[in-house]
């Protein structure tokens, strides 16, 4: 696991984009996350695309998750969100951006179908954020560390947190389709980004805590090619922060 500590959110985005861009140029398969954490990364990748530094025209992309009951064109679907925040601004083919089928009346069937589709591909680089409690995608604490794509009932706090995107809290879906931690772990490379003091406990658990379902992010300690990129605030509770900075400086380029 590589730990990169950056000055601020913008620098986090630049560092993450620099790792991801070579895979895009090669026409790789990307794993995309939504939420606030990867926004600076997407903004930097868009800037690089507009500057002619990278192309996504031969890429495929898989989203982490989707609300059960929402169509892809629903304004609150994650597929719609990733289009607004990223894929509509680059040259990736829209039909090559895949997400779980939240509109399938049988969500368990949708989960199995999405798992099979991902298994048929090899995700070259997976972009991840992390929740304040260490959750990745909708894999909350106590999720199986080897779990596959599944239907996940949303924690009441998650419903409350996401209510700001809907007209009323009653409109927030109560379930989501999400890649499991076992699914995510099959990605060839993982880049997790986190910023802000609110993520400091989760980053400490992910990097320096035991590998445990109590902190889903800790599964990345078992991955051969995981990179954690954080700002100073998110790194503020790491006991070995100075060591990580030194290791990054001494890395052979």
Curated annotation (Swiss-Prot):
Keyword terms, alphabetized: Carbohydrate metabolism, Hydrolase
Cystine bridges: none
EC class of the enzyme, as a word: hydrolase
Keyword DNA repair applies: no
Species name: Corynebacterium glutamicum (strain R)
Name of a matching Pfam family: Glucosamine_iso
EC numbers on record: 3.5.99.6
Keyword Transmembrane: no
Gene coding for it: nagB
GO molecular function: glucosamine-6-phosphate deaminase activity; identical protein binding
The protein's role, per its UniProt record: Catalyzes the reversible isomerization-deamination of glucosamine 6-phosphate (GlcN6P) to form fructose 6-phosphate (Fru6P) and ammonium ion.
The protein's name in its UniProt record: Glucosamine-6-phosphate deaminase
Upper taxonomic lineage: Bacteria, Bacillati, Actinomycetota, Actinomycetes, Mycobacteriales
